[in-house]
Design a protein with these regions (language model features):
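Bacterial N-terminal signal peptides that target proteins for export
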Residues: 2-14
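Solvent-exposed adhesion/ligand-recognition segments of exported proteins
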Residues: 3-6, 20, 25-130
Length: 130
């Protein structure tokens, strides 16, 4: 009897967490995580808890990410050498990319994610090419 109650409570908690993540998806992730520059030169910094700055020093850069999502209050900004510069962002983790915040760049920003990319109703992408 006691085990049954524990299972019921655990199931109810799991269902509640799942429902919350479906209703409020923008609040279950943070700025892109685990960025590693594998080609070209770029510096990744977080000037604040809701801002990420990527300063790209070469025409082309490739960055591998564990996850690449941007929540509603968050912003990711790429500063590139010029409008023809390209940053290829490869997501190597298992989660889809959820863009509910702002992604800006003066050049091209490409995001490749085998799990998919969703731009939500509050998502803003302002780049030269995407």
């Amino acid at each position: 009897m006691q085990v049954s109650r524990l299972k019921n409570k655990a199931t109810a908690l799991l269902v509640a967490l799942l429902a919350y993540s479906l209703i409020f998806p923008a609040y279950i992730f943070a700025l892109p995580q685990g960025g590693q520059v594998v080609a070209g030169q770029a510096d990744i910094t977080n000037p604040s808890a809701v801002n990420m700055q990527i300063n790209q020093a070469t025409q082309k850069a490739i960055i591998n990410w564990q996850q690449f999502s941007i929540a509603a209050p968050e912003a990711v900004n790429f500063t590139q050498p010029n409008a023809a510069a390209i940053a290829l962002n490869r997501v190597v983790g298992v989660d889809p990319s959820l863009i509910y915040g702002s992604l800006t760049a003066n050049g091209g920003v490409w995001v490749i994610n085998p799990a998919g990319i969703l731009v939500g109703s509050t998502g803003v992408i302002n780049v030269n090419s995407f």
